[in-house]
């Protein structure tokens, strides 16, 4: 990735659109802290986050494969990022319940990922990215594994939820229709 200068206002839904190999996911990985920028600064709210480890950046992430822990229940998957942040059990339980309600999955907290459909897994991955109330959520082609009908439904749901919560989203896709449907800016 060369000469990227990007400013994203709070609450914007920005999509990075391009073909495979164009650097979209690399940009997300640098924002998340999983890859290191060789030059320049990555700033969040005016503060450089270049030397801050991924788990301390306060950034939510939804991957294409959802990255849910198969040995954990839905509630345990959502609670994990809160445990890493050392929140008390009562606070974790409250935040997990709120996040599950946000994605209309409140009745699924005791299930394991293998017991969920692709769309349900996608909602749980989204809830996990939002459970700790991040300022920024990164999404790397999260709808790629879904069928057309469910993908279109989830496009609407993700966009509506992001705007309702006022969160900033950086979304990666190679699908032009998806980008134009969901984004404030492409």
Where are these regions (language model features)?
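Helical segment within the ABC ATPase nucleotide-binding domain
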Residues: 152-165
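Short alpha-helix of the ABC ATPase nucleotide-binding domain corresponding to the H-loop/switch region
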Residues: 148-155, 176
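A short, surface-exposed alpha-helical micro-motif characterized by mixed small hydrophobic
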Residues: 179-181
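ABC family nucleotide-binding domain
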Residues: 1-148
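Short, glycine/charged-rich "phosphate-handling" switch motifs in NTP-dependent
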Residues: 185
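The feature captures the ABC ATPase H-loop/switch
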Residues: 29, 175-177
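Conserved H-loop
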Residues: 64, 166-172, 174-175
């Amino acid at each position: 990735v060369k000469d990227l200068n990007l400013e994203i206002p709070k609450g914007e839904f920005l999509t990075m659109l391009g073909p495979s190999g164009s650097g979209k996911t690399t940009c997300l990985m640098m924002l998340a802290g999983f890859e290191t920028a060789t030059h320049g600064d990555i700033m969040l709210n005016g503060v450089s986050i270049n030397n801050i480890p991924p788990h301390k950046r306060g950034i939510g992430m939804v991957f294409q494969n959802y990255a849910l822990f198969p040995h954990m229940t839905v509630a345990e998957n959502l609670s994990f990022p809160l445990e890493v942040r050392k929140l008390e059990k009562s606070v974790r339980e409250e935040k997990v319940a709120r996040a599950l309600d946000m994605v209309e999955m409140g009745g699924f907290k005791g299930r394991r990922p293998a017991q969920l459909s692709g769309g349900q897994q996608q909602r749980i991955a989204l809830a996990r990215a939002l459970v700790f109330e991040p300022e920024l959520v990164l999404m790397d082609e999260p709808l790629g594994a879904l069928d057309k009908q469910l993908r279109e439904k989830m496009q609407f749901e993700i966009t509506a939820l992001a705007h309702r919560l006022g969160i900033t989203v950086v979304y990666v896709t190679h699908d032009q229709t998806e980008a134009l449907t969901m984004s404030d800016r492409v």
